[in-house]
Amino acid sequence: MATTCEEVLVSPVKSTAVTPLKIRELINEGIVCGERSGIGRKEASETPEENTAFEDLPGNNSYESTSKDAFFSRVESFSSLKWAGKPPELCPLICAKYGWCNIECDMLKCSSCNAYLCASLQPILDFSKYKQRCVELQEALRKAHEKFCFWPDSPCPEHFWALLVTEPSSVLSDFVERFHNLCHLEMQLPSLKHEDVKSMDITEDTVSRLLRLIEDELKPKEGREANSHSLPSDSLQVHISACILALCGWNTSFSSGSLCIINCPRCMRKVGLWAFQQLETVELDNSLSAPGTPVSPAEGHERSPLGFMSPSRRVTRSRDAEQSPAFAYGRTRSSDLLSPADSEAVRNRPVTRSMGQGENTGLGNELHSSPHRRAKRPRLCSSSSSDTSPRSCFDPLSQHRSWCPWVNVCQASGTNTMGSEIQEEARRKEYGWKEVLKVLLAEENSRTISNPDTSSVPEKSHKVFRIFRQWQLAASS
């Protein structure tokens, strides 16, 4: 009997596959009696189920690598406060590609295996060490997962966030959809600065061609139903703003309810339009009956009721008038208008020490503190403060996050070029929104050649030119 026990106790040492489960089975067989051994086997039989559940975890959750909604929910967990100062190789798109979410400052967590990764970059002067640390973090995005995690072997595909400029039909349908959604905001759309539009090389002719393309796409054609219902707004001013915003990748977030919010579906940036000048606050001349005659600045001031003064300029003038010497003199010399009886009452007023002012009188306190109250008064306006507060124009490019595909060099996938043609094509690549613009203009050009009927083109083009000139007047005033 003793020999049998010794053989049993020695056998685990000789076994090559030593696991906690095997040791438990050997202990139960050699020491515990038969009744308790059965209980031990029952407990041991439950353990493989847990291990099996863990091993089946990749199979159960592997859909996350093919779910676009799950991918962008991970991208949305990154913010500028918790993930700042990272190179493009560690942008949220790359981290979310391998299943990482941002939970704390410079701290990542896997959405499947719950592994943690600290991605802090220490401020060092040695650039080579900095690059080495970045390379280590890039490797850690793939290797820091648990042993049975599926993310290193099956990351998300890049077409989740890439701009598919090689598919013109997809580019056009997405552009028209964004334009239609933005038109629902109507006059709540942000007003665009003429200098910003000019720096983007977007001319009046470009906008006219894009609007013609949208109009042609929305028309019902033979063998094809209309893509959407009629546009929510007929204002050309709304169409121009929505067209430029849609070209730069902006869309409307309907989940926000009544709030006017636009968002970027790529970098998950959300912008509240109440912080910017809106079309309803810009006083443009709506009389577009004579598009052929140019409008001079003098005519623009005569036609506009207030000579086209921006809200920020009105606030500046009101503050200048309030802080002028005449205004301050009138406020500080108001004590001269008191009657002799009132002056005597002021001199006989008891000294107020509750505020620690010593021997200063109450009138002295009021006069001494009035300049501070005047400085704060513009911020204590009534409900009209939202109409007169200085608000800047919306820049459709700078409002994107720095790693957004719309404002970075487009990297198209699925190209058929080979050899030196790949390098030549990569050299010609431009920003994402410009690549989309090329595709849209090429599509519009092909339709114009096939259908030369452009009877309504000159009238709409002149109206677009007219609005662009009015935007230029707004920028110069």
From Swiss-Prot:
Disordered as annotated region, ranges: 287-392
Q: Where are the zinc fingers (C3HC-type)?
A: 95-149
Q: How is it modified after translation?
A: Phosphorylated. May also be weakly phosphorylated on Tyr residues.
Q: Which GO terms describe its molecular function?
A: zinc ion binding
Residue ranges with Polar residues bias: 354-363
GO biological process terms held by the UniProt record: cell division; protein ubiquitination
Basic residues: bias regions: 370-379
Task: Tell whether Cell cycle is among the UniProt keywords.
Answer: yes
Sorted alphabetically, the keyword list is:
Cell cycle, Cell division, Metal-binding, Mitosis, Nucleus, Ubl conjugation pathway, Zinc, Zinc-finger
Q: Where is the composition biased (Low complexity)?
A: 382-392
The main location is: nucleus
Which GO terms of the cellular component aspect does the record hold? nuclear pore nuclear basket; nucleus
Tell me the InterPro entries matching this sequence. Answer: NuBaID_C, NuBaID_N
Q: Where is the protein localized? A: Nucleus; Nucleus envelope
Q: Name one Pfam family in it.
A: zf-C3HC
Lineage: superkingdom: Eukaryota
Report the protein's function. Answer: Required for proper positioning of a substantial amount of TPR at the nuclear basket (NB) through interaction with TPR.
Name the UniProt record assigns to this protein? Zinc finger C3HC-type protein 1-like
> Which gene name does the record give?
zc3hc1
